[in-house]
């Protein structure tokens, strides 16, 4: 079947479809040169002839042409470039006729024999690894079927070899892989024998890139055409020469490594190797020059060379690490590596320039086939002599001799040669630094060595500063990283790189912190060898200065990195370096040639170095830190001291500042500071005294005062004018508190005096269980009894049966005394549920159990309330006393535990939860069984609740449960009208403080009729008590109450109340004299009393709605309020309590006016008119 090739776009490779054999329609460069080189037209006859020649049948299918298109389309990376380089030519459509492939003649050509011989030698060479290099198969035999050797997918055979492609692989590829495995095994064996050597250094990258570039150029230069065709014969010879040169260099490197291992004096042997390598380079120099000329010639040869260079750059990305085995041998013996010759070091320096620049360019190359033209534009600037030349970096593997000749040429030339050599060095070192910075995988030892080399020359500050001032940087070096971080392998023992301070600072941010630090021993070594470095850098080597041999230096821009030879041994003193080098040169046969080569290569660098050293004397030295700080110190306000160690120039420059210095110009002297401290201390004391006076002038005892003696002393110490001032502007606060003061009702030390949760036992109550649950509870302990109760056993047991009284009483006591509030709430829930279930049994003749007055009194008494506080009134006492409560409880709960624990308090704080639970249960009992308590008992319970509400700790707790119980108790009183005056008089006696009495009035609920009545009557009783009026019977009618209220309101004038209090106080005083402070206190009490009385007046008048008949009484009350109370109050900013009383007056007056407006006027009057008082 005939295969047709689709035309491909220019600049893009044509790859075969997956799963198909590679196309055989690669057009020959010779026949399509016009189409690829430019837009030239070709005749149809030439095109047809080229197609026919291309598809001629081959002589033998088993043998392939060397590097023929049949093995093309090897893809590298993501750019999909092929080895053959023919993808840049446009592909033409093949003839529709079936053509036969031209066979290769069966006899072997001399080129193939030469390459086969190289492969055999390559197999014998165990020192170099070829594993990373793509193999070109040249054998006539194939591997056995089923051999698992990896071959990249891009190595496609021709269509005729499709049957053999699935079963065979190249024997040379297999051989190279075996060589790679043997070399790795040898390296592992050497690593075991040299286990004592811990320091591993990497092979110089110059050797790596040199070998890889040579091998690439040799392979890329091989012809892709038939050997019988004349246009490509010269290129076959050139590729063969390159291959032979590569084999020769491999042999030389192998000999050099063996000599380094076996011989201690490697200096002479290394020089011999360098001479041999230079002779080999001169041997192949004409062919390289002929190849360079082909780059300039336009046409077919130029285009093919460009393609070959392009492919050589493509291969360098995969073959850059090829000769690592050679480096591994050198790393095995780091002690002998220290004795390397200067020739090999300089050679590796030159070799590491352009290959690394090419590698950096390849690493930055964008992916994609359309970027292939950009590789040709990458050039290297070389200036041997005065001629500038652009050269493609792809041909760098053959330029080793050019580098050496370019380095030797300036030795016989003038200053222009030095300038051009420095420029080329700048360009190459720039590429090298950029490449090194882009490789983070470099070994740590190599980075440390480069950093040490840069740090050894950091002390030459004057030389580097002069170089930075007069150097002209090229545009190519504008983006180059610092030299401190460019790890150029210069073997650290013979050459060093002076690096500027700015570059070192810039490189420190890019290098790791661990690599940039130096040890203390290394710093000591730098201090010792500083003199040696300066002597060698000035040109004192081999017995004399180098600058004198080559004439005076010219002022040209110095190189960015100057390669300066230094002392071979870092431990040797500086004065012995020239003699040692002379003795080493005399003992070797090739020392003179080595010196000439050293002088020729670094002639330009030495001249620029000489120029820097000569100009160093004229440069002004940098000022030290002390001098700079002295200048800044002198520019500040003048001081008495002088900065130490001032130079003459600095003293002359700063004479203007020091001339005006005079002592005693400090703004903050010692005397001034002491005076300021004394003033500050005096002001602080005065501020404290004023604050104390302000506190004393307010009339409130200061918390700082301890006794009256201290206060009198403080008052005596004040001036009269100060006393008047404080008295005039003192502000009295909290004269009328918002909350009642309350009383201490509960004594927690007496809590648990009768029983507690540990002494209460249901088995001691005389209860006999009948059901299974009752028996279970009786058999259980005290803790288990509480547990069964809270888990609902009692609720289920007495759901349909009456609960015995001992169980209910035990639950009531346990609820009041249990310290856990959650358990107390659960017991309350159980007790209320059982009580409600017992009330539903209507057929039962027995009322449900409710706690008696003695049970309630015993519970509150056990909480810590004194018996007298429970029943404070002498005329209203219960039928039992305190001893009865204690004896009754002891009879029900007997045992040693009760006697032992009776003296231990069970509560440390107010048991508000237990109190509220008892009140809640009492509220349930009074609502279920209203007739459970007698009127007397109800009155005692009401008085008990009122007394308990005066507890100080209950002021912030809403007593809603108390009010609910009070409503039930007032409702259950049978003879209400008879009991109201008695109840009011009893509540009036519960406290003597007016504000506490007002609290008791406000506790009475006003949302019931009995509650409002009790409030009105109680308010009138308390008003009469506070006004020292004789007790009279309180009228029940509301009209009479309002009329009585008008009489009381006239006596509520604050001034009248104050007079009464003053008279009463004078009667108590023996001398009958009242001072101003006491008078102020009495005034506060008078207004406080007025405030309480006005609240009680409001409770009387605003408790319920009034009829139209009471309208005239409210009109009289409003007039009396304004005339006697409001007009008597004189407001003052210092006396806030007056304003508070007047505000209450305004509110009461507003309420009364609302009542007046709501009441209808009397019959026959449309409007009310003011009638003056008679």
Curated annotation (Swiss-Prot):
Region (NSE6-like domain): 665-1167
Keyword Phosphoprotein: yes
Residue ranges of the region described as Disordered: 1-110, 162-233, 256-374, 396-474, 498-621, 635-666
Phosphoserine, modified sites: 482, 604, 608, 615
Principal subcellular localization: nucleus
Similarity comment: Belongs to the FAM178 family.
Record protein name field: SMC5-SMC6 complex localization factor protein 2
Originating species: Pongo abelii (Sumatran orangutan)
Lineage: Eukaryota, Metazoa, Chordata, Craniata, Vertebrata
